[in-house]
Amino acid sequence: MPTSIQFQRSSTAAEAANATVRNYPHHHQKQVQKVSLTRGMADVPEHVELSHTHVVGPSQCFSVVVQDVEAPVSTVWSILSRFEHPQAYKHFVKSCHVVIGDGREVGSVREVRVVSGLPAAFSLERLEIMDDDRHVISFSVVGGDHRLMNYKSVTTVHESEEDSDGKKRTRVVESYVVDVPAGNDKEETCSFADTIVRCNLQSLAKLAENTSKFS
């Protein structure tokens, strides 16, 4: 079964990273800082650590969620890299249309409409990174009707250790930085964003594992 690890409330795989982040004054910082959100995690390739290094402003919060998937990297990436079709695994997405570009080239922009019940209607999201070789994808929110202003997400996919029966496992790491809305604090903002990210990655894991079984 897929398991997720929420950064602020981590278990075994992220304990070292959690300790590292506690040393950052990210709840009270007064200036811009650079934060590596995977530092201290075991078996993290260098390019993954670099990808999850963010510049964080004094009115922003940040977090990272880790998801292990019992499926090959290629299967996970084939789903995750479809910038034009996030609703394949993001159940909070009602529809998505690419309004600029082809959905593959950096600079492409998609309009994402979300299901009712969320404090948002739609968002405009720009593709910042699409690296098929290193399996890195990143997008930033550049407009829309929502409360997550200046949201930037980076997601990486890399091969993890094999499990007891020799099957390949994949580790998905998603980190983000976002402005804290007026009237909210950093803990509230990260808690909300973490919940969405965690649900998305759990759904991604289930889809990839089911796809892998029949491939």
Swiss-Prot record:
Q: Describe what happens without this gene.
A: No visible phenotype under normal growth conditions, but mutant seedlings exhibit increased sensitivity to abscisic acid-induced inhibition of cotyledon expansion. The inhibition effect is more severe with the combination of abscisic acid and jasmonate.
Query: What's an example of a GO molecular-function annotation for this chain?
Result: signaling receptor activity
Q: Which top-level group of life is the source organism from? A: Eukaryota
Any idea which positions bind abscisate? 90, 120-125, 147-153, 174
Residue ranges annotated as motif Gate loop: 116-120
One example of a Gene Ontology biological process annotation = abscisic acid-activated signaling pathway
Q: Where is this region: START-like?
A: 54-209
Q: Where is this site: Involved in interactions with PP2Cs?
A: 119
Q: Where is this motif: Latch loop?
A: 146-148
Give the InterPro entries listed for this entry: Plant_def-hormone_signal (IPR050279), Polyketide_cyclase/dehydratase (IPR019587), START-like_dom_sf (IPR023393)
What keywords sit in the KW lines? Answer: Abscisic acid signaling pathway, Cell membrane, Cytoplasm, Disulfide bond, Membrane, Nucleus, Protein phosphatase inhibitor, Receptor
Can you supply one Gene Ontology CC term for this chain's record? Answer: plasma membrane
Q: Where in the cell is it found?
A: Cytoplasm; Nucleus; Cell membrane
Give disulfide pairs as residue numbers: 61-190
Has UniProt tagged this entry with the keyword Nucleus? yes
According to its UniProt entry, the function of this protein is described as: Receptor for abscisic acid (ABA) required for ABA-mediated responses such as stomatal closure and germination inhibition. Inhibits the activity of group-A protein phosphatases type 2C (PP2Cs) in an ABA-independent manner but more efficiently when activated by ABA. Can be activated by both (-)-ABA and (+)-ABA. May link ABA and jasmonate signaling pathways by modifying MYC2 transcriptional activity, and regulation of JAZ6 and JAZ8 gene expression by MYC2.
Question: Per the record, what about its domains?
Answer: Upon interaction with ABA, the 'latch' and 'gate' loops change in conformation leading to a tight dimerization and the creation a surface that enables the receptor to dock into and inhibit the PP2C active site.
Q: How does it assemble?
A: Monomer. Homodimer. Binds ABA on one subunit only. Interacts with HAB1, ABI1 and ABI2, and possibly with other PP2Cs. Binds to CARs protein in an ABA-independent manner, both at the plasma membrane and in the nucleus. Interacts directly with CAR1 and CAR4. Interacts with MYC2 in the nucleus. Interaction with MYC2 is increased in the presence of abscisic acid.
Q: Which family does it belong to?
A: Belongs to the PYR/PYL/RCAR abscisic acid intracellular receptor family.
* Protein name (Swiss-Prot/TrEMBL): Abscisic acid receptor PYL6
Task: Give the species.
Answer: Arabidopsis thaliana
